[in-house]
Design a protein with these regions (language model features):
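DUTPase catalytic domain/fold
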Residues: 1-197
């Protein structure tokens, strides 16, 4: 069953999401409609995460190399600059490229919940695809977030603002949680965690 805002708020008070915003924020200053932000916080049946400003990496082409998920070469990634102007802080994701960021919020997924991460409509309409995998029962940490820019234009990816939406699905209790099996991505810090086996 998909969980609602009442459940999300209750579980957040028990530490499921930190820091937590109990309502959907669309303006940093509620009285100043001139300064909108990409919404974040609790919505009717989900939670909009923010992108951390701490790190954003972009894949680069190194002639003659092939990426290997069993032996990932971090040299295939390059750090990007955090830019700032009157619209806010942002990274640039080049056209037809792939980037990795990290969620500002830390999560602690309950043992009977699986979390699915999907894109936000504002970014989707610019060709940005969120390709983040599920957060399983018992997983804890900062999600590493994956993005593809499928458009032919560079795109701003705003930091400290909404980047994707989490959906919380409740299931029957499982016999082994992600924490029980000592999953390799458990307790990810607020930095990009690279592929590992």
């Amino acid at each position: 069953m998909l969980k609602n805002d009442l459940w999300i708020n209750q579980k957040a008070s028990e530490g499921m999401i930190q820091p937590f915003q109990s309502n959907l924020v669309r303006h940093l200053e509620p009285d100043n409609k001139q300064k909108p932000v990409l919404s974040y916080g609790c919505s009717s049946y989900g939670y909009d995460l923010r992108l951390s400003s701490k790190e954003f990496l972009i894949f680069r082409h190194i002639p003659g190399t092939v990426m290997n998920p069993k032996n990932f070469n971090p040299n295939n990634l390059e750090k990007t600059v955090l830019h700032h102007d009157s619209d806010g802080d942002f990274f640039i994701l080049p056209a037809h490229s792939y980037g990795l960021g990290v969620a500002l919020e830390k999560m602690k997924v309950p043992e009977n919940i699986t979390v699915i991460c999907i894109g936000k409509s504002t970014y989707a309409r610019l060709g940005i695809i969120v390709n983040t995998t599920p957060a399983e029962a018992g997983w804890e940490g900062h999600l590493t977030l994956e993005f593809s820019n499928s458009s032919g234009a560079d795109c701003r990816i705003y930091a400290e603002e909404g980047i994707c939406q989490l959906l919380f699905f409740e299931g029957d209790p499982c016999s082994t949680t992600y924490e029980d099996r000592r999953g390799k991505y458990q307790n990810q810090p607020e930095k990009v965690t690279l592929a590992k086996i």
